[in-house]
């Protein structure tokens, strides 16, 4: 039964990763903790290993369509890896509850914007008018901020990277997702290198989840290529809204626990 649950987790997480470029961990971690009944630390560490294979598989679809800007991907990766280390080292001294609320509000606004466009919330900035060097510097800063939030909150940065690339740097939704997957590979490798020493990685779950996740990541990436940018942005917006609502709920749930009162 555990193997079946792990396989279902791989199917859902892999498909979401390929479709949206957010790595799959955003969906996998809740499934691993709630559905597979893993402890939080083990779920995070195990998910990170799976995400490496999932992101590589999904990225191949974007690579074949030439939907990756490597200058931005490299700059984002450098910033994200550094930011993640900073976030992870300072997470115990920061008010996690407030950070989660801010993050959830940010994602909620972004989700509404991506689903309904400028008619409700206009967050657009024409980043295409920036010089190539300024876009690279901006990508480095976005990576630093996104990586730091990821390290602080124990989340993947894809939910931050993709909206920032679209709304700030004016990138097409497909290209933003392709870039995000490359960055996620870098950050997942960095995080896994640290986790290998912690003993939190469940190799059995990795073996069960990864194969279906890889297959569905490729399928998700292929389907994403069939959608126009506006439709794909709306799909991504729905996923981002889910992440925002889940973040609100988990923060509320923690606040009601006796040791948090």
Language model: regions and residue ranges:
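Small-residue hotspots at the loop-to-helix junctions and early N-terminal turns
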Residues: 44, 174-181
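Transmembrane alpha-helical segments of major facilitator superfamily
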Residues: 50, 75-76, 179-183
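Transmembrane helix boundary and interhelical junction motifs in multipass membrane proteins
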Residues: 21-29, 152-164
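N-terminal signal-anchor/start-transfer transmembrane helix
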Residues: 8, 12-18, 27, 190
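Membrane-embedded alpha-helical segments of transport systems
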Residues: 49-58, 90, 185-190, 215-216, ...
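Hydrophobic, membrane-facing alpha-helical anchors
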Residues: 22-30, 54-57, 129-139, 183-190
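Hydrophobic alpha-helical transmembrane segments of integral membrane proteins
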Residues: 26-27, 49, 159-160, 182, ...
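Juxtamembrane transmembrane-helix boundary motif
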Residues: 1-15, 34, 40, 60-152, ...
